[in-house]
């Protein structure tokens, strides 16, 4: 079963493959907004994370996280409800394969969480985020008619269309502010770097959700030149380099960062 469900809350989630089966990917939760925002604030103010991210505001404040989480909860509410209905319907039939699964246009599984145990029972902690959205073709010259044309075409393709180009990442909109991203904001807490978690998170999102439930055929991603960890994540998931764009990201004085170059990667299919 690609999508798992908490038997008590009926929350849908993805589970990472071994040896990371204690890591799950869930939607954001209304009852954990403050806790998750605090975890986000800690990670996104760490130079081992924010150095490689163009979009999130810096310094990142708890209210930024709360606004973001509330937005994502609303965006994914319908998908989460549909999945819970699927779970309930399948539970009432002897053969779960009798129910046809819907095709969706978004991935509600954003929160990378580590599941632990304490005296009160099972708990989990937010340790990162992963997002899957329609690709923005940010390698094309900004504010050009070519960019507007390809973005409009990709956006207008109907749900499940095989020609949709997707990307790992997201565009951040916080309150009345707009932060235009030119590469993904996926991140992992530095306390969990170097353990293969993000590689397996990408694998789970692609294999267990994007391909079977979004009919995904085309996927691209990018990373800042010098980010060795991100390159490894892509390569382990069968991505190949298709281009390098020098000085593509503007200076970020708040982070004391100059212009940065990006590498575009393209997915070559399931391994």
Residue ranges of model-derived segments:
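Short hydrophobic/aromatic beta-strand element in the GNAT-like acyltransferase core
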Residues: 78-101, 106-113, 129, 165, ...
């Amino acid at each position: 079963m690609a999508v798992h469900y908490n038997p008590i809350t009926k929350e849908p989630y993805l589970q990472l493959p071994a040896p990371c089966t204690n890591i799950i990917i869930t939607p954001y939760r209304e009852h954990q907004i403050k806790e998750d925002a605090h975890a986000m604030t800690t990670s996104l103010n760490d130079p081992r994370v924010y150095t490689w991210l163009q979009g999130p505001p810096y310094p990142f404040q708890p209210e930024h996280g709360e606004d973001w989480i509330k937005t994502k909860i609303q965006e994914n509410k319908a998908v989460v409800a549909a999945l819970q209905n699927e779970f309930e319907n399948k539970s009432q039939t002897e053969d779960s394969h009798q129910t046809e699964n819907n095709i969706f246009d978004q991935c509600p599984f954003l929160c990378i969480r580590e599941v632990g145990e304490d005296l009160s029972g099972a708990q989990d902690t937010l340790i990162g985020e992963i997002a899957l959205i329609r690709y923005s073709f940010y390698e094309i010259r900004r504010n050009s008619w070519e960019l507007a044309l390809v973005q409009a075409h990709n956006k207008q393709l109907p749900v499940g269309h095989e020609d949709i180009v997707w990307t790992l990442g997201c565009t951040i909109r916080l309150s009345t502010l707009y932060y235009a991203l030119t590469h993904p904001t996926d991140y992992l807490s530095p306390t969990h770097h170097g353990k293969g978690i993000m590689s397996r998170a990408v694998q789970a999102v692609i294999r267990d959700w994007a391909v079977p439930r979004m009919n995904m055929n085309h996927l691209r991603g990018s990373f800042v030149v010098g980010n060795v960890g991100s390159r490894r994540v892509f390569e382990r998931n069968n991505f190949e380099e298709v281009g390098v764009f020098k000085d593509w990201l503007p200076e970020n004085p708040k982070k004391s960062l100059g212009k940065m170059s990006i590498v575009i990667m393209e997915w070559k299919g399931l391994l």
